[in-house]
């Protein structure tokens, strides 16, 4: 149940409703009782038929008769044409009726909406529901079209004849303005047997299927005055108006009875009784035969005797007799039906749940019809708390049912059964009976209030600084542990530790990125508490690691995991551990399955074990400041085990909010510029956790040294109601130069921007959110916390008796110079990776120059591990010294060039000047390993040492390694194309377009963008698995087992990330790869040219790897460190530039998967095939559920099961009406079909791409983008993307980007070409477009306090957006053509006389109102006027518009 339509605004599917005729559901400012469910199109048809209902309606039914139906419409009604949406809805209504799902003992009443079309259906219980569905609704759309009502914004159809009761009335009404007031009024009229009057009407004859015979009114025409009105409503003259005719006061003979229904008069009642009118009047002592005094529900005698007493008695347990409200009920009819007065009915319900009196009654509420205890209320399918949670048992008498099923975390429960922590949920506004709330509020029934619960002050106010141990991986903004200002903190947290699949603690990416070095330094901190934080967002949510926490806390594994963690903390003499699991029980984290609801209790049990194993250490956990995620934590019980909670009161908002209507109050799009550290929301979060039972002195509150950034939708609009660009997975904010993550920018980077005043547009403190706001480069917006704001927050939190504060993170605060002993951060990071102490000073370090070829590490190479040889020959210091010579002496002289760097290194090692390791082997004389004696022979004293041999030979492996890939992805493509590509790719390219795009796409500038995207992505997908296999087979790493495999993967990621950056960079003219991305004559040729791009990028990578830049030196250091590329006891690296058959086969598979996985869906898109993925809404067990949209054979050949959801890959073939372009007289219905070429996919063609991969990739892209289409192309520099592509997983988000939607959304787009642009992005899953008839809009501000509310104007736009609404207006004056609530949009012709009309389209209104709001919104109001040119029957005309 929902309390207003705003809660359903983002739903794009068909919606079916149940609500009272008398509930003004269009009023968004008051509460309602709206029951709703969605349909993906075929849902009613796939439910089991109610054979009992079907049998009951057909048994003893009279023969069908011919009936006269009226189809009418209102030409002047505002709104858009209902025809297209009505087709969708009537098909589903037919399924509902034909399967016996309607009512049989009362009228069938149903409300529905699709797009801006609202529909109401009424079928009296004397009419056969199935017959209405089969015979009437099946032809409704054609009938409307033939009645010239196809463009009407309000259409109705009825069978409603004078003299018949409401039991024999059928009506359907559709309006195109998105509202239900006129729909409710129509159904209310039909329920009273009052027919609608149409301005334009057409009568048609059709079959009328009956359950009971029609009343033959002519038979009684001479007996009953023909002008006497039948009953159509309950009469009432006072609050006790309902008469109780002849209520039996004592036992005596009672009569048989009949009940009054709408439309009855005494003659029809007598007919129901089967007696004459005279007898009927006699039995009931009726002297005045005026039917207007009859009351619906009232009983009359059909025989002699006393009218029975129908008033109920209490149930045996003392509970009152109950009644469930129906859509067409009111108090008068209920009272009359049960021999009660309205006053009695009111008195019986003073304590009934949600009773707010008779006006209105709410559908499905359970009320009392007698004295007695109030009943339990009806359950609500979506209730989370309170007495209406499904399955709630009736408690003992005297129990306050408001306290049943309290919310997790002691959160507030509102009257709708929803849990929350804001004032919307937490203020009790009850109006009397339990479960009520003041109009326009949600009320509160349990755990009300938002106050922060303060405990005693903490014994120590904690000052926690997080240190990102991985910060040396960034291209800049480094901090060594030694540079942390320890005086500012009581605790330093090292982020992050990780766990292996066997629950061993690891420092991830340790040696390769310097994290291990920083961790070792972290352990040496004295005077400050040292805590290792294990987990974090990435570890908790990465597809490869998310199960470690989930499985680790289970009973089978928790002791092992806890023991390993405890041993690690004790072995490293740390002061404690923090567990950062994000988040137990989470159901909606993109890319991974929903978690178990048992996670929380398992986590608690794990913490108990861990605490027992570390009784003298600090144990803490991280917890989210979000109710949605925190409710998965048994946080009160956890607080009793842990020392305190790191409370993440940041990231309250971010790019991920886009398209999420629940993420931001007052922002239905979710894309408003909001602070991620808003003080009001933070205080609400503090209330939540302290109300949940965590003492405030155990809550360590988060502050940040970074900001959340957005790309503003409009320059100059930077307030909290202004919006940003991009979808949930596509931030368009400028990345920081060091953090390199769009939407996230370090304080150090912010301060650097502020230092350049030319970039700064606005810089201020927003008082309401207590946040620094920076607007720069015109459209870049950042919410952040300066030191001043952080200090003020810290004081506030201390005053609230919080346990302290925690700052993420120390290394984001400022730019640090390299530690004083290092000449640069490049030198420092290289030393760290090499395990060389960067703080040792001197020209030559270590003993490498004094070692000789007689050393055991040289002589016994085949019997000593690689890492030991590297260490004993002091190669790390040798490399460090060589780099020092380059950066301090040679680079300033030679410049940053590839030959210069190689020359410098070779000179340092006295290895000759002819080496050029940046050239493809065998060129450059860097492809052959040399013996130690060769190096020792240079120089007078052999001071190169054997270390030079290890380093040089490592270079040759790199050279050959890179050339190995070149031979596969370059030489075999570039030289004669007679290898892999020639036979595998190029031969298939000739058939590629013919297979997947029989009509080839026209040449487009878009081809170049696609080619460049594939250049980086494809290189990653080809090279990553290749490098991972090569590095994993190195003797140095193979000997390390699982740890070695992890190192190989880390090195691969570093190499590939570097290669991708080179592939898309501008390189010097001397670079060997001179390929340029250019469009070719055909799409297939254009895409095929990327193969040359990959090979050239590989050659360029080798060239730049030896150019002496900071990034190249860092990668070289990673590659050669610890002896990865030398021979040892495990053997020598088997790398040469000749290519084996097995390697060719592997790379063939890599290339095929990378190329065709990207190119096939892209070709479908640009060729206009418009292939897309249907989300059926059904589990995988469903059998062909979409027969309305696809044939059974298509469903069987295009489906895939993913996460137990059934999906289909299809496309809209041909024209929407099922006809060919010649439009034959008879057309066959068209269905979605398999896109061209899908049937040719196999394990031996097109790279082995599968149907499942195409579907899964598209769905992953859709989900990662916040369940929205239009997500960005995958970023090969993204860690998750890199990991996926390294595993040849092309289903990573952003690689395959076919749109995803339900069948009915796509069908609406396909079948309404006037409202859908088939060339638009996302077709046919894009929303229907509005109509544009005007141009040249001008604007003038008219906003005052009396202007319409912005919220009403936004609702007006929502109601007409994407519709075919078109208004034709004459010149006779101003006309309001669209309105909602306080907001009206009107037009008036300017300066044209005569018989002239002009047109205004729905999109014109949307465009104008959107711009007016952005320009003139003031204190929630907007008013404006202006001019435009609109098309009309006399050409383009000047029209004045007004928003008032």
UniProtKB/Swiss-Prot annotation:
GO terms for molecular function: chitin binding; endochitinase activity. This is Probable chitinase LysM18. Probable chitinase involved in the degradation of chitin, a component of the cell walls of fungi and exoskeletal elements of some animals (including worms and arthropods). Might be involved in manipulation of host defenses for successful infection. Its EC number is 3.2.1.14. The active site is at 582 (proton donor). Disruption phenotype: Leads to enhanced fungal virulence, with faster decaying on infected fruits. It is an enzyme of class 3 (hydrolase). It holds the Pfam family LysM.
